[in-house]
Regions:
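Basic, nucleic-acid-interacting segments
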Residues: 1-169
Length: 169
C-alpha cells in the first residue's frame, strides 16, 4: 500500500498527477529511506514458493543514471545480494515437462511515468508524473531455459498463478 522507501501511498494509477510524492521520493537532501517491510515479506514468500534460497544477508544498491524518469538521478535496487536466489519453476508445455531455473528474485523501486506530448508542431515536450516513482517492484529473473513461446507462456501463466495464490500480485 505504500512505496518502497517512504510512506507515500502507492495507488498512483488514478491519483492526480504528482500528488503521491514526498521529499524521500524526490531524493531531496537530508532525507533517508525506510524500507517497506511488507514488500520484503512478499518477495521472500515468492522466493520460497519458487524453491529459492533465502540468504541471511541482503543489500540494496544505488544504480546511478541520469534519465528524467527518476528525479533523484539514481534508483535503489538489488543485484548481487538479492532477497532470494537459485530457485526453479517446473512447467509443462507441448506435452513436455521442463524446469526453468530462477536466478534471483529481487526488489527495486519503480521510476516515474513520462508522457511525451507532440501537438504536430515544434513544441514537442515531455511531462513527468512522479507518483509511480518509488513504488515497490519485485523482479523474478529466470535463466534462459525457455526454448519456445509456448514454454514462455506456460512459465508466465504458472508464475502468475503462484503470485495470485500468495496474494502478492
Amino acid at each position: 500500500q505504500s512505496k518502497m522507501f517512504c510512506s507515500c501511498r502507492a495507488d498512483y494509477q488514478t491519483a492526480p498527477v504528482n500528488s503521491r510524492v514526498c521529499p524521500v521520493c524526490l531524493g531531496l537532501p537530508g532525507t533517508l529511506p525506510v524500507i517497506n517491510k511488507k514488500a520484503v515479506e512478499f518477495t521472500i514468500m515468492t522466493g520460497l514458493a519458487l524453491g529459492c534460497e533465502i540468504p541471511e544477508l541482503t543489500k540494496f544498491d544505488r544504480k546511478n543514471y541520469p534519465y528524467p524518469d527518476l528525479m533523484k538521478g539514481y534508483q535503489i535496487s538489488q543485484y548481487d545480494m538479492p532477497l532470494a536466489m537459485n530457485g526453479q519453476l517446473d512447467i509443462t508445455a507441448d506435452g513436455q515437462d521442463r524446469r526453468v531455473r530462477v536466478e534471483r528474485v529481487h526488489l527495486e523501486e519503480d521510476v516515474s511515468k513520462l508522457q511525451h506530448v507532440n501537438s504536430g508542431n515544434s513544441d514537442a515536450h515531455s511531462l513527468v508524473d512522479v507518483n509511480r516513482s518509488g513504488v515497490p517492484l519485485m523482479e523474478v529473473v529466470s535463466h534462459p531455459d525457455m526454448r519456445t513461446p509456448e514454454e514462455a507462456r506456460a512459465y508466465l501463466t504458472k508464475l502468475h498463478a503462484i503470485l495470485q495464490y500468495l496474494g502478492v500480485s
